[in-house]
Each structure stands twice: as C-alpha cells, then as structure tokens.
C-alpha cells in the first residue's frame, strides 16, 4: 500500500481508540490490517453507493471502530450500534446510540437507510434468517464477514 492510499484518521479519533484499547485490551483485535482494510472499504462503499443514507444500524459493532471509520467519511450519518456483548457496548455508548441485544431480537423503532451485519460468521442459519427477515422492507443491507474457521466461535463462512 503506497503512502497516498493510507487512510487518514484524525488525532482525536486515534486518541479515542487508544483509550479504548487501554480500557478494553481485546479491542486491539479490531485493528488487524485485514480488519481496518475491510472497514475502510465498507465506509468508502457506503459513501459511493449510498450517499443519501442518513441513518444506519451496525449489527455486530463490537467496539464501534467501523462506526468511527464511517463517521470519518460520512460525518452527517446517524449510526446505531448493536452487539450482544454488553462490555463493548459500554464503550460505543460514549459516541453512538448503542444497544446490547442479540441482533435477531432487535426491534426497529424508526426507519433506517441501511443495516450492516459484520458478524455473520458467528450466527447459525436460523439466527441469520430471523435477523434477515426482521429487516424492514425497502432497507438496504450489507453483509460483511469472513471465512476464518480457525476461530472456535465461527459457525459459518461468508
């Protein structure tokens, strides 16, 4: 990757992330090169293909790094973060509306432009179907996961 292609993040965001890693050491796993590349790709994709989107929900948000990267590219975007793990949600609540709930049980309270599911590899087909069938009609959706079966809690591949 040439220096001109390196994503640029502002100082406050980097400080926020490092505070997060100090408070939550497992947050460091959100910063593997493959994680950052997939998140910056997705944020660029949203900016290019859904420029009019105003409110999105990120399912499997974990510590909100994807939300932060999207916010860098689309500053007016309202982002709602959902994760079943309450520990990371406490961190994301510092910056975004956040809820600790299983994604297939989430209740939509108002319209959203798009939903993003970043943890499909952690869901059984039954859970995935329940989540997918709950998405309001006319809502864009993005699925992003991985095919790393070396992780014990990965039950499916994308």
Regions found by a protein language model. Give the residues of each.
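C-terminal substrate-binding/active-site "lid" region of AdoMet-derived donor-dependent transferases
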Residues: 124-158
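Conserved class I S-adenosyl-L-methionine
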Residues: 51-63
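A general structural motif
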Residues: 51-54, 76, 111-112, 136-138
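Conserved SAM-binding loop of SAM-dependent methyltransferases across substrates and taxa
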Residues: 63-74
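S-adenosyl-L-methionine
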Residues: 1-51, 84-110
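A short SAM/SAH-binding and catalytic strip from SAM-dependent methyltransferases
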Residues: 112-126
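Conserved SAM-binding motif I beta-strand of class I
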Residues: 78-83
